[in-house]
């Protein structure tokens, strides 16, 4: 009887593992080149990213940049392509690499698309990395 119970439990465990679907948020790579020059963009946007969780913040990882604390470069979450409304606080990036949690100040919903905006107010800034809404 004990052997049969172990077999049944093992079979159930295998079936659960086979049909379990891992849930991971959509991670989008970004690369921004911003500048205050007349012929340059002072802000740029990532591609649309699908929000797949109910967290109250977005996650941004800067993997390479020329950012310093004097650059006055900010990240913000905005709506999908065509919607330039801000959905989060603006967070100033102050280091060449790092992780930023950007908290939402408006309702956001799982299943909707959002974009990351990078904006400079002072100097030429290049930054790249990945983010998830």
Please give the residue ranges for each predicted region.
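Post-signal peptide N-terminal regions of Sec-secreted extracellular proteins
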Residues: 26-133
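Sec-dependent N-terminal signal peptides of Gram-positive bacterial secreted proteins and lipoproteins
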Residues: 3-25
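Short alpha-helical segments used as structural interaction elements across diverse proteins
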Residues: 1-4, 77
């Amino acid at each position: 009887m004990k052997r049969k119970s172990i077999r049944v439990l093992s079979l159930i465990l295998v079936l659960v593992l086979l049909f379990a679907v891992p849930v991971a948020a959509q991670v989008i790579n970004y690369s921004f080149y911003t500048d205050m020059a007349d012929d340059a963009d002072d802000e740029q946007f990532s591609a649309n990213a699908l929000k797949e969780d109910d967290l109250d913040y977005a996650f941004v990882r800067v993997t390479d940049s020329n950012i310093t604390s004097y650059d006055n470069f900010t990240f913000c979450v905005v709506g999908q392509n065509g919607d330039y409304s801000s959905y989060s606080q603006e967070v100033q990036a102050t280091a060449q690499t790092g992780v930023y949690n950007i908290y939402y100040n408006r309702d956001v919903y799982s299943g909707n698309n959002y974009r990351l905006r990078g904006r400079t107010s002072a100097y030429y800034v290049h930054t790249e990395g990945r983010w998830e809404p």
